[in-house]
Amino acid sequence: MLADSLKTLYGTNFAYFVKAFGFHHNVEGPDFGELHDFFQAIYQDAYSALDPTAEYIRYLGEYAPGSLERFIELSEIAGQIKIPRARLMLEELHANNDQMLDVLNACFASANEENQQGIANFIAERLSAHGKYRWQLTSYLKVERA
């Protein structure tokens, strides 16, 4: 059911936003400035997707989740307790971004099955954004060859 897929997306995106937001404030090291800005771009983009996702849930006649407990329950992404070093932040966001892509692909399939083209278009835009983050995060993590 598309509404359930969107709720999972909503919770997962919220967790992704919170994690990138925390990494933005807590990153340290020689690449601080660059990573601080990069994490900011990610969390701002994730935040911007929350409201439209909730509105599409309402459009389908369901209520959007509205509590931290419900977000945690719905999310495919685990919360962050400790503050990792910069490289581990990148590795974790890379893995979480792949989880976002999986959730988005499931939503896209549901939207197409239910002939909800407007929602499918929104999801396609999110897939494009997270596809870009995937190659950017992969590039940050690439080890130079000797």
Outline where the language-model segments fall.
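Acidic/histidine-rich alpha-helical segments that form the ligand environment
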Residues: 5-6, 16-19, 51, 55, ...
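Short, helix-capping/interhelical loops that line the mouth of catalytic, cofactor-
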Residues: 26, 33, 62-85
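Short, contiguous alpha-helical
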Residues: 120-146
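Short, surface-exposed loop/turn segments at secondary-structure junctions
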Residues: 29-39, 117-120
